[in-house]
Curated annotation (Swiss-Prot):
Alphabetical list of Pfam families matching this protein: Ribosomal_L29 (PF00831)
Transmembrane segments: none
Disulphide linkage map: none
Keywords: Ribonucleoprotein, Ribosomal protein
Family: Belongs to the universal ribosomal protein uL29 family.
Superkingdom field: Bacteria
GO-annotated biological processes: translation
Name of the protein in question: Large ribosomal subunit protein uL29
GO cellular component assignments: cytosolic large ribosomal subunit
GO molecular function, one term: structural constituent of ribosome
Length: 64
């Protein structure tokens, strides 16, 4: 997910996206713990996406 795509979304949409990403991260952590996760790079991708969304939420909050 690109930051330019996220910038067009509203704060509510970003919060929904953040919630979805956190759920995905939890699922990946459970898969990793049970040794079912084959592609471990997904963990870092989701973590970076969470950081992007949180950064944009913060930027929009500061602007208002």
């Amino acid at each position: 997910m690109k930051a330019s795509e996220l910038r067009t979304k509203s704060v509510d949409e970003l919060k929904k996206e953040l919630l979805d990403l956190l759920k995905a991260q939890f699922g990946l952590r459970m898969q990793l713990a049970t040794q079912q996760l084959s592609n471990t790079s997904q963990m870092s991708k989701v973590r970076r996406d969470i950081a992007r969304v949180r950064t944009l939420i913060r930027e929009k909050a500061v602007q208002q």
